[in-house]
């Protein structure tokens, strides 16, 4: 019934966070919960072919990929992945203090903005998913999981 794009961080298992068993949801995991063509194809399959009714992009606090992007880490293939997070860093203007991975308020805000950016990318890059959403056949929403409290905040930008 649901497709969840979440991070590879072991603390962010969608099955555990949402109390779902194996086979209950489509779980797509990638560092920084970023979107690429393979992930879009997986979401299109889960919704158009398998009948999933909701896509949730699930970010989380204290995300190592977000922290690495905030710290401008450049290493191998990781560099390209972190570049997809950079627009969220540039959009974050609310947090005072250091604009790096040591400022956890900054990191949390970037995590939320990254989810918002990924939601926009889904709608812009997949005409299939955008059409299904426009027709009311699926919902595309964002969520942020707080590692410390276990709370999940849902939102639609």
What kind of region is each of these model predictions?
Residues 4, 28, 57, 142, ...:
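Divalent metal-coordination and catalytic microenvironments
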Residues 23, 32-50, 64-157:
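Divalent-metal-activated hydrolytic enzyme cores
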Residues 1-34:
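Short, conserved "active-site rim" segments that organize catalytic pockets and cofactor/ligand binding
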Residues 8-11, 61-65:
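Gly/Ser/Thr-rich loops at beta-strand to alpha-helix junctions
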């Amino acid at each position: 019934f649901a497709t969840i794009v979440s991070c590879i961080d072991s603390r962010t298992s969608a099955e555990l966070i949402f109390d779902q068993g194996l086979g209950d949801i489509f779980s797509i995991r990638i560092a920084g919960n970023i979107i690429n063509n393979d992930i879009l194809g997986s979401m299109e399959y889960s919704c158009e072919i398998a009948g999933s009714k909701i896509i949730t992009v699930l970010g989380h606090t204290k995300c190592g990929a977000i922290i690495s992007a905030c710290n401008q880490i450049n290493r191998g293939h990781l560099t390209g992945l972190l570049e997809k997070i950079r627009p969220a860093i540039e959009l974050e203007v609310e947090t005072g203090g250091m604009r790096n991975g040591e400022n956890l308020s900054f990191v949390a805000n970037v995590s939320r903005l990254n989810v918002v950016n990924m939601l926009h990318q889904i709608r812009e890059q997949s005409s299939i998913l955008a059409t299904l959403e426009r027709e009311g056949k699926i919902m595309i929403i964002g969520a942020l999981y707080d590692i410390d409290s276990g709370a999940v905040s849902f939102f639609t930008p």
